[in-house]
């Protein structure tokens, strides 16, 4: 019997369009001889809409943007159900068929542990990281604390709350300028794909960048800018993760002063070098830090570790991404392709890891013996 693979994408997130691109790519790579593919589109308004079972490849991303008029509206994230009515969408029920959910969601309400919690409550296997790893890695402030506890080197940074910025802006700027030197990068704590991130080279730009970042989150992290190579590495597995070859991001002709949202997803001017050349000793250190980060987060399935490597060979772990993009030009699947694991095989491996993790969880004891 085929495995029913529920493909969940879209979502109430600034990264809604990225999620659609990821879903389009994954769906077209599925082996429909092995999987029964059931797409569910989450609209910008939070509605869950079930599309038809897929019988072939898609031609356009827009084919995934279902509407309630021509498909089945399953549920909504807003409170519209009457008291006592079941809240789990019927499509998530296995009905005796082996079922796995593949959440192709990015950003808040997607890779931050919230939707993962739903699958945990429903006891359905799902691809990728659990609640803890997803939420911790999504929050740049919490993530940095975990890395620091593991002894992983990071660039200097300062965390700022919106309430403190409103009440003590001058003092906060003074603290930042004491710890950091320009340029700095200002980032919302809970967002990915460089959304809301700005580079600041002076006090005026810093204030503008803080205003921009606080549009997306009430907590912001300000990081020291460094002149460095941007090198990424894929991590794959559960309890015994393995690393891919390293890849490097090279924006052509100074397309962007940093690898921003537009460069990542909206143009083809970003060059990826896979594998990239790294000193063997540094490469081993990179693998060690990537695995330490994976295990420190209690990650599962997949993680992409993003590093900075300076000219004098200082290595910093910038961040990890627990749901890296799967677009045709995304780094994570390309890293594994060059390591020897093709795209379709990578997807199947992730599904197998989801089943493995779910089985291990269900083997645990959840009640005391009489």
From Swiss-Prot:
Which residues make up the binding site for Mg(2+) 1?
306, 319
> What does the entry's cofactor note say about binding and number?
Binds 2 magnesium or manganese ions per subunit.
Q: Name one GO cellular component term.
A: cytosol
Q: What is its EC number?
A: 6.3.2.4
The first-level EC class reads ligase
Which parts of the sequence belong to the ATP-grasp domain? 144-352
| Entry superkingdom | Bacteria
Task: Give one Pfam family, short name only.
Answer: Dala_Dala_lig_N
Q: Which reaction does it catalyse?
A: 2 D-alanine + ATP = D-alanyl-D-alanine + ADP + phosphate + H(+)
Where on this chain does ATP bind? 177-232
Q: Which GO terms describe its biological process?
A: cell wall organization; peptidoglycan biosynthetic process; regulation of cell shape
What SUPFAM superfamilies does this protein map onto? Glutathione synthetase ATP-binding domain-like (SSF56059), PreATP-grasp domain (SSF52440)
Q: What is its main location?
A: cytoplasm
Supply the PANTHER family for this chain.
D-ALANINE--D-ALANINE LIGASE, D-ALANINE--D-ALANINE LIGASE A
- Write the protein's name: D-alanine--D-alanine ligase
- Which species expresses this protein natively? Listeria monocytogenes serotype 4b (strain F2365)
The gene it comes from is: ddl
